[in-house]
């Protein structure tokens, strides 16, 4: 009885915290809308929403293609094609022009942001609100235990960058500006984080039951389905996303903070701070978000399904797995190789067993140092001109949608697999297909044990959980190869 009461109190506590966060985002979005409306931009926004305009900016440049053309283009983006095909002078010139155009676009975006800031300087009350948000993030991390290892430095970064006159986020000598340029804005820190994740990850459950990779892949439904949510959100006055921003928001559905930072840094750096905070917030809220969806989509009988113990996995299998994973990625999806490559490297030095000093350093000291710097760099982007906008509220809503659909995708795939499998799998482990390791696996185990205290699903759920890490990295590679290359 006391346990049930504590669970209810925890759920009520999480609900209150989530409500507070949404209300703050709502206030900030209206403040941003009011500021933009007073500057006379409402007319342009209305024009953008006209019936003749496209739903997502940038999609008007995407020409319809046939199925055969689609697969032909996919084939040209594989590592196999690039290794055996000698590029023509026209292709080299086109690639060079594309890179130059991207650099010009970045410079124009930076110049436009500086011009907007000069035209509409940050007001004192806006800095005060951002300071309050920074302290709120620290409070949630310390008192409520919401991802404290990351949220504390993010909160302090938010506080430090918004101190009037301190200049910690100003270039070229501000400390937070240096941290951001050194590792956050150029993907260096997220790569190191993935190396650390690899050193801490055990792929044994996935190797023992490779079918679980399907559940990790199905959970990416939330990532791609969110693109439709972005299209719908663009009908709301004051919200206006382009295709790159849509992809950066959608990756929140993978429940992977480093990947969200990596993709947003590549495609939508102006939204990185909100996307990172949203991603880590929903990762912390896994015990609240997932169980209702799990119970809604499964029956009591399905939740009580017991699975056979996993077979032992040899050291040779564990050592070869990261190498095989890297080779497949190189051959089929090179844009995902940076993330997968660092994950494979970290896991290989752990499993090979002859460089324990390296693996322990990557897993502990290096991971901790980079986490601090990465989080401070993300916090340095929590400035009024980037946060106080209706798009910030949209990110919070769409992130929750992505996470919920990803959970549902894994559950539904598990139920579909049971139609063809002799040895049934418990659909609850499908919810662990999101890459919140190991939180999602623990939630699946907890919900299963609530139905049957003797039903231990943790190791089974770790299979789709680590597959979700790989799946999210692959989804990131698809987005970057499509819109960021």
Question: For each predicted feature, which ranges?
Answer:
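Low-complexity, proline/glycine-enriched hydrophobic segments characteristic of transmembrane helices
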Residues: 16, 30-123, 238
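Transmembrane helical segments that form the transport core of multi-pass membrane transport proteins
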Residues: 37, 93-96, 326-410
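Structural signature of hydrophobic alpha-helical transmembrane segments
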Residues: 119-130, 178-193, 245-251, 334-344, ...
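Interfacial helix-loop-helix linkers and transmembrane-helix boundary segments
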Residues: 142-151, 170-180, 201-215, 355-364, ...
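Alpha-helical membrane segments and immediately flanking helix-loop junctions
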Residues: 181, 185-186, 195-200, 214-225, ...
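Entry/N-cap segments of selected transmembrane alpha helices
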Residues: 206-227, 384-410, 461-465
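Alpha-helical transmembrane segments
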Residues: 270-288, 398-406, 429
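Membrane-embedded hairpin module used as a gating/binding unit in multi-pass transport
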Residues: 278-354
């Amino acid at each position: 009885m006391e346990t049930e009461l504590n669970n209810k109190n925890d759920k009520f506590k999480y609900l209150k915290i989530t409500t507070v966060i949404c209300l703050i985002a709502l206030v900030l979005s209206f403040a941003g809308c009011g500021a933009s409306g007073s500057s006379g931009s409402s007319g342009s926004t209305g024009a953008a929403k006209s019936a003749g305009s496209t739903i997502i900016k940038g999609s008007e440049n995407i020409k319809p293609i046939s199925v055969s053309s689609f697969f032909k283009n996919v084939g040209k983006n594989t590592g196999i094609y690039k290794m055996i095909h000698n590029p023509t002078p026209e292709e080299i010139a086109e690639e060079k022009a594309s890179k130059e155009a991207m650099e010009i676009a970045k410079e124009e975006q930076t110049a436009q942001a500086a011009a907007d800031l000069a035209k509409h300087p940050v007001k004192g009350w806006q800095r005060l609100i951002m300071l309050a948000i920074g302290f709120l993030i620290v409070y949630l991390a310390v008192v409520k235990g919401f991802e404290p290892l990351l949220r504390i430095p993010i909160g302090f970064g938010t506080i430090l960058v918004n101190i009037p006159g301190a200049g910690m986020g100003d270039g070229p000598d501000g400390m937070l500006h240096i941290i951001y340029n050194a590792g956050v804005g150029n993907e260096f820190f997220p790569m190191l984080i993935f190396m650390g994740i690899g050193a801490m990850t055990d792929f044994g459950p996935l190797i023992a039951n490779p079918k679980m990779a399907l559940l990790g892949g199905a959970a990416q439904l939330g990532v791609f389905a969110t693109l439709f949510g972005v299209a719908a959100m663009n009908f709301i006055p004051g919200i206006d996303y382009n295709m790159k921003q849509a992809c950066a928001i959608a990756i929140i559905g993978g429940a992977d903070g480093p990947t969200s930072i990596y993709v947003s840094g590549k495609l939508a750096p102006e939204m990185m701070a909100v996307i990172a905070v949203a991603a880590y917030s929903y990762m912390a809220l896994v015990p609240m978000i997932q169980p209702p969806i799990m119970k809604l989509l499964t029956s009591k009988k399905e939740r009580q399904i017991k699975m056979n113990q996993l077979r032992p996995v040899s050291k040779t299998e564990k050592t070869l797995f990261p190498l095989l994973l890297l080779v497949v990625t190189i051959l089929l999806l090179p844009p995902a190789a940076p993330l997968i490559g660092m994950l494979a490297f970290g896991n290989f030095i752990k499993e090979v067993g002859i460089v324990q000093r390296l693996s322990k350093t990557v897993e502990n000291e290096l991971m901790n140092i980079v986490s601090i710097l990465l989080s401070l760099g993300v916090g340095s982007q929590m400035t009024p001109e980037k946060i106080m906008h209706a798009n910030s509220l949209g990110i919070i809503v769409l992130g929750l949608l992505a996470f919920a659909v990803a959970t549902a995708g894994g559950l539904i795939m598990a139920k579909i697999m049971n139609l063809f499998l002799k040895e049934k799998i418990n659909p609850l482990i499908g919810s662990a297909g999101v890459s919140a390791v190991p939180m999602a696996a623990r939630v699946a185990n907890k919900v299963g044990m609530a139905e049957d205290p003797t039903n231990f699903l943790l190791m089974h759920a770790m299979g789709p959980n680590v597959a979700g890490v790989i799946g999210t990295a692959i989804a990131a590679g698809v987005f970057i190869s499509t819109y960021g290359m």
